[in-house]
Amino acid sequence: MGAQPSRRRMTEAQHMALAELPPELLLQVLSHVPPRALVTRCRPVCRAWRDLVDGPSVWLLQLARDRSAEGRALYALAQSCPADRNGHDDFPLCALARFCLLAPLGRNLIYNSCGEQGFRGWEVEHGGNGWAVEKNLTMVPGAPSQTCFVTSFEWCFKRQLVDLVKEGVWQELLDSAQIEIYIADWWGARENCGCIYRLRVRLLDEHENEVVKFSASPNPVLQWTERSCRQVSPDCSLNPGLLQGLSRLH
């Protein structure tokens, strides 16, 4: 009494049902599976399933099903800027699969941007008492973590290389003149300390040759004046014309 009915185990015939579907119908079925499950659960089933998941068709169907304004725009981008079918030696999945999995558009591509994982992902040079990670003195709206990198007394530097292709943006999309990359950072000073800040951005090609560079040098904060945070951005956005041949940000 009160026992729940046991779930029936699928028979061998039921297990075989999907395998017997023609590729066109199987493609439609797989296109309803969430992206991560497609890769981790469906791809290892057999060679036929692996080939479908590795190819672009199932991912195009997923994009086409999203009828939001953003979804329609992404689908149009994927159709107008098809990725090289030869793919990339480092990635078994097609470029469109990586795009759907990693969702690079509209998110922050800087890893560990607020120091919530210490200095992981950053190359740092220590000056004075060196770098540290502390809680924000004032709230930074929209930040993934209310922590920040702090320095002391002398110039300190931190750098990060962002591989846009590994983040899910395929090269043909970068070359298409249809997307923009926006760069910004938050900075500020303690009330009892002055502060000088510089932001430099280098755009590199796949061979790490510099394509173009930008910088921002806001006015220094004087001692005993304020301790608020402010946003800074180079006097540019990485507009489509500058992304030709670009694959990395530094």
From Swiss-Prot:
One of its GO terms (cellular component) is cytoplasm. Residues 99-250 form the FBA domain. Keywords: Ubl conjugation pathway. Residues 15-62 form the F-box domain. GO terms for biological process: ERAD pathway; glycoprotein catabolic process; SCF-dependent proteasomal ubiquitin-dependent protein catabolic process. It comes from the Eukaryota. SMART domains: FBA, FBOX. Pfam families: F-box-like, FBA. Substrate-recognition component of the SCF (SKP1-CUL1-F-box protein)-type E3 ubiquitin ligase complex. Able to recognize and bind denatured glycoproteins, which are modified with complex-type oligosaccharides. Also recognizes sulfated glycans. Does not bind high-mannose glycoproteins. Part of a SCF (SKP1-cullin-F-box) protein ligase complex. Interacts with SKP1 and CUL1. This is F-box only protein 17. It comes from Rattus norvegicus (Rat).
